[in-house]
């Protein structure tokens, strides 16, 4: 039995389900089968019973226990139950009614299968007797009914295949009676049926046949020899035929079991009784018990074990020593009593008997191990109770034949990574026996912890103007998980800071959590910003958490105060006060803005230089007031240097020159009190708004009326200034193409064209030649006086520039009102056309005073500001007398970045667009500032190359355009944005707008040194011109707007004193390039007098002073004549002239 129970002690894998699965499978096989006989397919039957078997695993079953491992076994891979050798049931189970082999196997899915194989008996053995002959002696005194037990036949087969009956040779004296023992075996007794008479017959011979229950039955025979002896009248007699006795299993040897006593009334040897085991008493029983033949005491001779056998039957006979003794028989049944002599046995079924691993995410009720506890004792001695020792998050759940260890709480590896479990089992016997089994449970890690920041809110303070890449702070998050589950990486959550991604402000090291600044912060733009940092682990799926980081930017004194009031021009403000101002009179209010905060942005005011004795300034509000009174003897102007400085640790300041002029005294009522500046400001704004509104309505109505005549724009060259002028004179945009390509060739055509010239064109002509109220020689020009002709190649390095027409200054002109030649316009010869007088087209003429420039560069400039070309670069160098604020404005100009919006836009609608040149009503206001800037600015320019394209076709023209006419797309620019390509293929447009002079208008010029020449003053002798130089001049006259500011006149007068500018109305400009590789270009600023003045001075050549006379007087004379004309033309500008100026500008 011990060998059969040893496999139960094997340890197996952990059961995965919450309750262990257990099934019972029963099979049967007949004995005497050869080795390898397949009993059953356990895998198939287990799968049908609900087992989850993994076909991918090589080993599906494992035997836990096997009561006959030498006879049967299970194939672990196929699950077939097979025999290992020939099974002899008669030898294995002897006479047991059932012969069963038990196996317990566990599948790969941790499920238990109990298999019982019943060995079916075959009738393969015949009954046999222990001896070949049975000899009996029967006293003749034996009365009928006397029973004499016979030796039983033995049949190894069991059940119905064992001995079932006995047969005796038929006779009249003796018979057989069949009886059954307690173990089911049958035996026969010989019964005397009639009285015997030794004298009649003393010897009998019979045959006894034993039959089993087979079909056909097997049989065994034995001879029976009966000898009739003389009688012993009394036989021993037992008190009872059956005795029952019990003995503890732990009884030592020689322990008495029972004392038998059989009485015999005879005397002597006939009454002396002898005891012995008789009949069928197996050898094992004879090993355990013995009987004293004289006393009849039955004692224990071997070790009793209740678990091995708990009932034994002893057949005892007693006979006297007399002759013809007839023995007496009795049966003693010995019951072995169970004692608590076996402690419980604990078997742990898991993957590893010493170490069990379970995930910390295992839910309550999860099975981690299977426990089987056994006790060989019976009853209360074998009733076992199990429990887990200690306070652990596990519990033991008991079932009928096994127990499971379940998770009974939340497991947390971070708090407790392993447990030592002890299982204790105890029985209920007396004394109580117990046993214990210990093993280790290791908790495996799961990604169940989020990264945890050391604090949810971080704040860092950094000064503005920090270095990009500067370290700000570090964030830290901890994850108590292990391995990748505990590795933390950082990233910034996408967000916006001032409409910009936060990634443009800061970055984070994903491993260390260090945060760095990606830009230099500006407190004035961003005082503080927040963003979130995300920390996530490396588990699957990853867990994450975030923290908020706030960056506070401290202000530093990095902004210089900017004086905003009074308005400054080149750092100078002019203020007018009445001469009769009293003490405390408010002269002006100085205002300065500082974008810093706190003390860094608090501005105070002071006067550092100038006439401080006459004025004082309030340091807080910047009010400049008088400290003295003024009279008629006071000087007309005063100067103050006003300084605005902040209160930062390193104070920054800005200064301005305030020029205070004394104006005529105010009336008494006007001089009382200070002027209400707010009221004046409101009235001025209202007036300007009203004027602008009326102007817009007038322009809209006018444009709408003009556009209703025809709404097609088929001229690809109308984007140039020259073409716009020609189209404007004709008054019809649709015929712009004809204004370039068509010119009358006959006087009849000239007259028809001259009749069509509108009043607008006449006013333009009048304005272009000057306007005189009282002159009777006023000469008008018609459309026939203006013709666009191809410019000669040798003059491509010269450009006539239209002069300015307004005296008003504005610093914003350079920023927003620069004219450009549309880059999309085709560079054809029509781009380089001159306006030519039809009447003097073939006559010899000379230049009138005009702006010209000479260049040796390969290209022409892209930008023209009031007729003066600017270089392509956006950064300029200025002379020392040019103020820094002007340079700042030009460098920061947005005009160079958006030329398309101001130069190329034409919507094609009836009304002008807001960015069209016709819509810009303030363009003339910026002229003088531009002229002054040009007079003080040095720039460089590139030359141009003459393209070879057809003058009437645009970039988008096709062959159909020559037949059907041009469409809107023909004049559209090729590139929407101007590029600054310096390739030779990218040619520029230069507009030369000239009007030929008549022969009477030819001017004289004089040499200035051996190499330089400039135009002579009015009234010089025409004969002074050398004949060989006349053809070079081409006789063209610039259509210039001749109204300029007094500053320009003074500059011209100063320039006229030198040899470089002999003419009083010309002044050379030298524009210097910031790039040393480009050649410098010389410009000549010219003011054209009216045509009749030219004739007047040309005809009065005899009365002119000689060349040796001083030229200053001649200059003054001309200027006296020119200035009234210029003033008169400025006072009586017509709307057409204004529009012409807008177009030209």
Swiss-Prot record:
PROSITE patterns found in the cross-reference section: CADHERIN_1, CADHERIN_2
Membrane topology reported for the UniProt record: Single-pass type I membrane protein
Transmembrane segments: 679-699
Carbohydrate attachment residues: 261, 420, 485, 546, 570, 676
Biased composition regions of type Basic and acidic residues, renumbered to the chain: 906-921, 1106-1145
UniProt: Ca(2+) 15 binding residues: 557, 559, 594, 596, 600, 646
Main localization category: membrane
Residues the record lists as binding Ca(2+) 13: 464, 522, 524, 558-559
Binding-site positions, Ca(2+) 14: 464, 524, 555-556, 558, 596
Cytoplasmic side: 700-1145
Residues annotated to bind Ca(2+) 9: 340, 342, 375, 377, 381, 427
Assembly, per entry: Homodimer; antiparallel.
PANTHER family: CADHERIN-87A, PROTOCADHERIN-19
Protein name listed in UniProt: Protocadherin-19
Protein's organism: Mus musculus (Mouse)
């Amino acid at each position: 039995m011990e060998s059969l129970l040893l496999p139960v002690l094997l340890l197996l894998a952990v059961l995965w389900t919450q309750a262990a699965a257990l099934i019972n499978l029963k099979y049967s096989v007949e004995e005497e089968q050869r080795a390898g006989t397949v009993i059953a397919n356990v895998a198939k039957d287990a799968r049908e019973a609900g087992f989850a078997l993994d076909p991918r695993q090589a080993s599906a079953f494992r035997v836990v226990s096997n009561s006959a491992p030498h006879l049967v076994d299970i194939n672990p891979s196929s699950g077939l139950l097979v025999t290992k050798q020939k099974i002899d049931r008669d030898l294995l189970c002897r006479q047991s009614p059932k012969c069963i082999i038990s196996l317990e196997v566990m599948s790969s899915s941790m499920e238990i299968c109990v298999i019982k194989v019943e060995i079916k008996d075959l009738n393969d053995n015949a009954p046999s007797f222990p001896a070949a002959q049975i000899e009996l002696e029967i006293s003749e005194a034996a009365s009928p009914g006397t029973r004499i037990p016979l030796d039983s036949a033995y049949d190894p087969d069991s059940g119905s295949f064992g001995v079932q009956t006995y047969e005796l040779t038929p006779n009249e004296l003796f018979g057989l009676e069949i009886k059954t023992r307690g173990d089911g075996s049958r035996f026969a007794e010989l019964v005397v049926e009639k009285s015997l008479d030794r004298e009649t017959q003393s010897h009998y011979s019979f045959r006894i046949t034993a039959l089993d229950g087979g079909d056909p039955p097997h049989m065994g025979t034995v001879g029976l020899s009966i000898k009739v002896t003389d009688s012993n009248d009394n036989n021993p007699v037992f008190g009872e035929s059956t005795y029952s006795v019990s003995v503890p299993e732990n009884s030592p040897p020689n322990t008495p079991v029972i004392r038998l006593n059989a009485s015999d009334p005879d005397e002597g040897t006939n009454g002396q009784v002898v005891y012995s085991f008789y009949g069928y008493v197996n050898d094992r029983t004879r090993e355990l018990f013995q009987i004293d033949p004289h006393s009849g005491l039955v004692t224990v001779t071997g070790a009793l074990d209740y678990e091995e056998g708990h009932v034994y039957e002893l057949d005892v006979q007693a006979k006297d020593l007399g002759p013809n003794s007839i023995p007496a028989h009795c049966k003693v049944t010995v019951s072995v009593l169970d004692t608590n002599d076996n402690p419980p046995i604990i078997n742990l079924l898991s993957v590893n008997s010493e170490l069990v691993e379970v995930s910390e995410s295992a839910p309550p009720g999860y099975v981690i191990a299977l426990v089987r506890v056994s006790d060989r004792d019976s009853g209360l001695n074998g009733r076992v109770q199990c429990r887990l020792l200690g306070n652990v998050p596990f519990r033991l759940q008991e079932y009928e034949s096994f127990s499971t260890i379940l998770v009974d709480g939340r497991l947390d590896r971070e708090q407790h990574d392993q447990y030592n479990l002890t299982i204790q089992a105890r029985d209920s016997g007396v004394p109580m026996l117990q046993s214990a089994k210990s093993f280790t449970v290791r908790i495996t890690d799961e990604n169940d912890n989020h990264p945890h920041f050391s604090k949810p809110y971080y704040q860092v303070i950094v000064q503005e103007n920090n270095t990009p890449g500067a370290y700000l702070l570090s964030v830290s998050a901890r994850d108590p998980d292990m391995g990748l589950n505990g590795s933390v990486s950082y990233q910034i959550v996408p967000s916006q800071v001032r409409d910009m991604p936060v990634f443009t402000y800061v970055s984070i090291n994903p491993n260390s959590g260090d945060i760095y600044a990606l830009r230099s912060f500006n407190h004035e733009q961003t005082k503080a910003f927040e963003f979130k940092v995300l920390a996530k682990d490396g588990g699957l799926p990853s867990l994450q958490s975030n923290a908020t980081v706030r960056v506070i930017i401290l202000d530093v004194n990095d902004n210089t105060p900017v004086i905003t009031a009074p308005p400054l021009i080149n750092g100078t403000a002019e203020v007018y006060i009445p001469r009769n101002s009293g003490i405390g009179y408010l002269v002006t209010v100085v205002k300065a803005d500082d974008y810093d905060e706190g003390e860094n942005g608090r501005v105070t005011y002071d006067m550092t230089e100038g006439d401080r004795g006459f004025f004082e300034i309030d340091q807080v509000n910047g009010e400049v007031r008088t400290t003295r009174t003024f009279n008629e003897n006071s000087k007309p102007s005063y100067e103050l240097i006003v300084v605005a400085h902040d209160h930062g640790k390193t104070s920054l300041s800005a200064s301005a020159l305030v020029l205070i002029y004394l104006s005529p005294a105010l009336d008494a009522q006007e001089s009382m009190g200070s002027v209400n500046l707010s009221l004046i400001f409101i009235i001025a704004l209202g007036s300007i708004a009203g004027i602008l509104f009326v102007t817009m309505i007038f322009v809209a109505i006018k444009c709408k009326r003009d556009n209703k005549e025809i709404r097609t724009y088929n001229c690809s060259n109308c984007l140039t200034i020259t073409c716009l002028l020609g189209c404007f004179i004709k008054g019809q945009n649709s015929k712009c193409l004809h204004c370039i390509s068509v010119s009358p060739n006959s006087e009849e055509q000239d007259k028809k064209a001259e009749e069509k010239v509108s009043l607008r064109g006449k006013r333009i002509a009048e304005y272009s030649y000057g306007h005189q109220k009282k002159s009777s020689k006023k000469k008008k020009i018609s459309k026939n006086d203006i013709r666009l002709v191809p410019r000669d190649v040798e003059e491509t390095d010269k450009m006539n520039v239209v002069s300015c027409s307004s005296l008003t200054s504005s610093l914003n002109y350079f920023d927003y009102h620069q004219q450009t030649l549309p880059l999309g316009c085709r560079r054809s010869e029509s781009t380089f056309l001159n306006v030519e007088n039809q009447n003097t087209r073939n006559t010899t003429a000379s230049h009138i005073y005009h702006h010209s420039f000479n260049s040796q560069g390969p290209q022409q400039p892209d930008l023209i500001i009031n007729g003066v070309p600017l270089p392509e670069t956006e950064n300029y160098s200025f002379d020392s007398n040019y103020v820094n604020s002007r340079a700042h404005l030009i460098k920061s100009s947005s005009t160079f970045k958006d030329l398309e919006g101001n130069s190329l836009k034409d919507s094609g609608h009836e009304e002008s667009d807001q960015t069209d040149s016709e819509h810009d009503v303030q363009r003339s206001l910026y002229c003088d500032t531009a002229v002054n800037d040009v007079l003080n600015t040095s720039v460089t320019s590139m030359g141009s190359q003459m393209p070879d394209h057809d003058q009437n076709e645009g970039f988008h023209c096709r062959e159909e355009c020559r037949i059907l006419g041009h469409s809107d797309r023909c004049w559209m620019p090729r590139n929407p944005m101007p590029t600054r390509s310096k390739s030779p293929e990218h040619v520029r447009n230069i507009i030369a707008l000239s009007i030929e002079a008549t022969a009477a208008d030819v001017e004289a010029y004089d040499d200035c040194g051996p190499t330089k020449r400039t135009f002579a003053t009015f009234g010089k002798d025409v004969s002074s011109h050398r004949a060989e130089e006349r053809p070079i001049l081409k006789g063209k006259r610039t259509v210039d707007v001749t109204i300029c500011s007094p500053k320009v006149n003074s500059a011209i007068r100063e320039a006229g004193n030198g040899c470089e500018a002999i003419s009083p109305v010309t002044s050379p400009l030298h524009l210097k390039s910031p790039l040393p590789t480009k050649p410098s270009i010389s410009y000549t600023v010219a003011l054209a007098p009216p045509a009749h003045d030219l004739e007047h001075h040309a005809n009065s050549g005899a009365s002119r002073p000689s060349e040796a006379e001083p030229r200053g007087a001649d200059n003054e004379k001309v200027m006296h004549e020119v200035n009234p004309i210029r003033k008169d033309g400025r006072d009586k500008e017509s709307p057409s002239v204004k529009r012409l100026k807008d177009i030209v500008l």
